[in-house]
């Protein structure tokens, strides 16, 4: 989102439709379109900010004590709001974690963010972060997770569940590559719905997981909303597990 000026009207329309359909979590980042995505979101949420759970993310190279504060303030201006519900470190960089967490705590005490968390953190990163001041308040870890990328189920997801840290799953339909898999298409055909709806319904059924599918077109938004009401049968789940088995050993965290 925000990468093409020509696409902005359709992207804004998709966001508005999502809000009208009751999908009120909006995830963005200063990286997306180098701030343009935040500007689009700001235009759409004007006048209805109180209905929305707003998430944004800071670049790792901006995540110093002063840099994160300045980056957050820029995001707030682009979004046209005075606070974020959740502010995440987009991925781990060279700036020490304790410095980033200190900045997040400063922003929280100033009322500019309500909670903070991380993105693309593997298990060892989470353990390290939680041991630092402010790390005990981690409110989410946003990671790549879908039927074809189930590596987090071995250790990271159980760790987060045990500590009550929600996992936000990005790319829940595998950037559309997953949707061409014969097994997924077979389940979708049997249920009379799209493969994307099956993939999202599977993810939504996972305990402690919030799916954040990309939706820049209204028809994608409608399909995403419909996935909420779809319950997969034991037969569906068995077929999906056979085609996309859970991990038997630890694998490195996948990232996009």
Show the residue positions of the predicted features.
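Active-site groove signature of glycoside hydrolases
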Residues: 79-95
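Acidic (Asp/Glu)-rich catalytic clusters
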Residues: 19-20, 42-50, 73-82, 105-108, ...
């Amino acid at each position: 989102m925000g990468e093409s000026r020509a696409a902005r009207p359709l992207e804004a329309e998709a966001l508005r439709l999502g809000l009208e359909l009751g999908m009120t979590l909006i995830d963005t980042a200063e990286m997306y379109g180098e701030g343009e995505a935040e500007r689009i979101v700001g235009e759409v949420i004007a006048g209805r900010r109180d209905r929305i759970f707003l998430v944004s993310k800071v670049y790792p190279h901006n995540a110093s004590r002063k840099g994160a504060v300045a980056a957050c303030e820029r995001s707030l201006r682009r979004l046209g709001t005075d606070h974020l519900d959740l502010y995440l470190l987009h991925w781990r960089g060279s700036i020490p974690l304790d410095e980033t967490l200190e900045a997040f705590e400063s922003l929280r005490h100033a009322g500019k963010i309500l909670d903070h968390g991380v993105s693309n953190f593997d298990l060892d990163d989470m353990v390290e972060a939680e041991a630092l001041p402010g790390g005990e308040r981690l409110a989410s870890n946003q990671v790549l997770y879908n039927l074809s990328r189930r590596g987090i189920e071995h250790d990271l997801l159980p760790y987060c569940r045990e500590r009550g840290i929600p996992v936000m799953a990005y790319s829940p339909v595998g950037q559309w590559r997953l949707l061409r898999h014969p097994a997924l298409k077979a389940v979708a055909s049997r249920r009379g719905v799209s493969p994307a709806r099956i993939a999202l319904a599977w993810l939504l059924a996972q305990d402690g997981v919030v799916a954040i599918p990309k939706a820049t077109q209204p028809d994608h938004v409608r399909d995403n909303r419909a996935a909420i009401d779809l319950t997969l049968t034991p037969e569906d789940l068995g077929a999906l597990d056979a085609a996309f088995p859970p991990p038997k050993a630890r694998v490195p965290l996948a990232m996009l």
